[in-house]
Amino acid sequence: MEINVDIQPDCTATLKASIPAETTAARRASIVDSYAAKAKLPGFRPGKTPKSIIEKRFKKEMEEELLDTLFETACSTALEENPKLKVLSFGKPEQSLDDQGNYTATSTMTVVPEFELPEYKGIEVKVPSSEVTEADVEEALNSLAEQIAEFTPVDRAAQKDDVAIIDFKTTLDGKPVAEAVGKPVGFLEGRDGQWMKVEDDQFLPGFASALEGLNAGDSKDITVTIPDTFPITELRGKELVFHATVKEVREKQLPAMDDAFAEKVLPGKNLEELKTALKENLAQRKAMQIDEAKADQITEKLADMLDFNLPEAVVEREVYGILQQKMQQAMYSGNAPADMDKFVEEAREEAKQEAKRNLKVFFMLQEVAQVEKIAVTEMELYNEVARQARQQKKNLKSYIRELQREGRVHGIRMSLLTAKVLDFLTKEAKVTVDEQ
């Protein structure tokens, strides 16, 4: 067997292989034996069908299996003979068997880019203070108070932070909005007894603030220009008129900061115990935020340290994934682009730059893992899969089979490895606390 690997500067390598006829004949004979042992053909007992009939009946299938087997052998031999070669994927081969049975194949491989790791220990990062202040606890208490505030009826004009209970109907160009656009528009058509907080941007820009100063029984026509990001494309940029009548004004009543308040928020606890629990929770959140800040700064600095060629096919796959994610985010946020093709075209360049940075960091982290002998154990992988199964309320064995069937186990392993390498780098980083 002859194997030749020619590495190119664009993260590809050409594999050329030739396997002599005597080797291919032995492989062919092994495949024929395998088919003969399993074949069930009319008129013959299992395993007793003449090989000449087997070769004729399954000629196409055995030829394909032989070529696949020979190519796999060529690939594994290439990796054995070139231990420093890091192959991401083998391209579909151009392969053939000549009349004498000699096998030849040529394949373009995508390989990991070659680069020298920069100094990755002692990366300087700046993080916020981990101290939880009394002001932090007070802010958390106020947020909880807002969540359980009550709204009581008042006999006065609506003010900011009040709630106005309104009836409204909506028109476009003098017609009911659904009639004007020719389809239902849901909530925008109108509502009776709608609670509306009197502040900007809770519903549509300028709508809620226009209720300020109105008393129960007052009516007002409120004109709003629909934003260009609105999910109903027919309404973007249009002026809608909301014919609103205030039925009732309610004032926000915040609870007193006492033990009764604490009991509502955290049953069985008094105010001091609630403050202690909040302080512990805030400390945990700050610790997580600091770890995230360290990891973000380290990856950004790693990406800026080196510039090297990346496999174009891998970049394109990453770009595709990023664009898919951006489209899903736009749709889930209610800002679906009117022209999806134009959206993709405009987002592609930004996605490509993001993809290149992601991949540079990925390959560098993989190299750090190899140098520092960082690996993911089978128990760590199992624990993560079990955690995901619990989170998704799935049977563990069924979930494992699902991951294996969909080829997602490797991705989970890589995510865990990336996290372990980043954890290693954060421990090795030079950390400065920003006291501001």
Swiss-Prot record:
InterPro entries attached to this UniProt entry: PPIase_dom_sf, PPIase_FKBP_dom, Trig_fac, Trigger_fac_C, Trigger_fac_C_sf, Trigger_fac_ribosome-bd_bac, Trigger_fac_ribosome-bd_sf, Trigger_fact/SurA_dom_sf
Family according to the record: Belongs to the FKBP-type PPIase family. Tig subfamily.
Protein's name according to its UniProt entry: Trigger factor
Free-text function comment from the UniProt entry: Involved in protein export. Acts as a chaperone by maintaining the newly synthesized protein in an open conformation. Functions as a peptidyl-prolyl cis-trans isomerase.
Organism the protein comes from: Akkermansia muciniphila (strain ATCC BAA-835 / DSM 22959 / JCM 33894 / BCRC 81048 / CCUG 64013 / CIP 107961 / Muc)
Gene Ontology BP term (one): 'de novo' cotranslational protein folding
Record comment regarding domains: Consists of 3 domains; the N-terminus binds the ribosome, the middle domain has PPIase activity, while the C-terminus has intrinsic chaperone activity on its own.
Enzyme superclass (EC): isomerase
Pfam family, one: Trigger_C
